[in-house]
Amino acid sequence: MPKLKKLLLKVSTSKPNTNPPSQNEEKGTIVKQEAPIHVSNVALVCPQTQTPTKVGIRIQSGKKVRYAKKSNQTLDEKN
């Protein structure tokens, strides 16, 4: 969903959705339904600590390098 800037992930991103009672049923039902999350709520997982982390950029030998701010570990290199 690029126009909405939302992602539908394979992890459990479900929200409860209520269905009102119909004429035949006594009670309404609560159904779990997959829901998209906004791009700003997605975080990179640090490979060392296995927790969400922010990403920093530093220059090493003339190249931009991304690193995890929690563990200070290099993630990959960019040109």
From Swiss-Prot:
Pfam families referenced in this protein's UniProt entry, alphabetically: ribosomal_L24
GO MF, one annotated term: structural constituent of ribosome
GO cellular component, one term: ribonucleoprotein complex
A Gene Ontology biological process term: translation
Keyword Transmembrane: no
Keyword Ribosomal protein: yes
Region named Disordered: 1-29
Record keywords: Ribonucleoprotein, Ribosomal protein, RNA-binding, rRNA-binding
InterPro entries: Rib_uL2_dom2, Ribosomal_uL24, Ribosomal_uL24_KOW, Translation_prot_SH3-like_sf
Biased composition (Polar residues): 11-23
Role played: One of two assembly initiator proteins, it binds directly to the 5'-end of the 23S rRNA, where it nucleates assembly of the 50S subunit.
Subunit: Part of the 50S ribosomal subunit.
Family the entry assigns: Belongs to the universal ribosomal protein uL24 family.
Protein name, entry field: Large ribosomal subunit protein uL24
Source species: Onion yellows phytoplasma (strain OY-M)
Encoding gene (name): rplX
